[in-house]
């Protein structure tokens, strides 16, 4: 992380900056909400069906330097989960009761053929027993 965010003192008991923690999958299960930017971790977290917000304060700069395969607004579950400022992020976190879970479900259906937890069974049936 080149420029980490500053977490206001009053939120330090609720918001953890995990950008230096290397095993991100370990913390997904204990997280109520995920704040990310352009990371592919959104796919894993979406399977937990918990709110995700995309803190894209530098989106134009990122697009100019690296770009995306698809428009960013179409990559995330909904443009409404993209926030550009820290105050907007705090507002979104305050309003998770109104999170668009329908958009999250559409995102999961678009990106995953199976979400039934039976991937190992299918693997055994198709690869080992065939």
Enumerate the predicted regions with their spans.
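Short beta-strand/turn micro-motifs composed of small residues
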Residues: 1, 36, 56
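Acidic donor-binding loop of glycosyltransferase active sites
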Residues: 29-39
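Conserved glycosyltransferase catalytic-site signature
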Residues: 21, 38-39, 120
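C-terminal alpha-helical cap of glycosyltransferases
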Residues: 116-130
């Amino acid at each position: 992380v080149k420029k980490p965010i500053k977490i206001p003192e009053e939120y330090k008991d609720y918001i953890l900056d995990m950008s230096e923690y290397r095993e991100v999958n370990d913390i997904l299960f204990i997280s109520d909400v995920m704040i990310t930017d352009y990371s592919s971790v959104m796919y894993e977290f979406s399977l937990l069906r918990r709110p995700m917000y995309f803190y894209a304060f530098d989106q134009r700069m990122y697009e100019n330097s690296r770009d995306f395969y698809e428009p960013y607004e179409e990559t995330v579950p909904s443009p409404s989960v993209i926030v550009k400022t820290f105050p907007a992020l705090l507002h979104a976190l305050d309003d998770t009761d109104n999170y668009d879970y329908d958009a999250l479900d559409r995102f999961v259906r678009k990106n995953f053929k199976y979400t039934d937890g039976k991937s190992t069974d299918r693997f055994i049936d198709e690869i080992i027993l065939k």
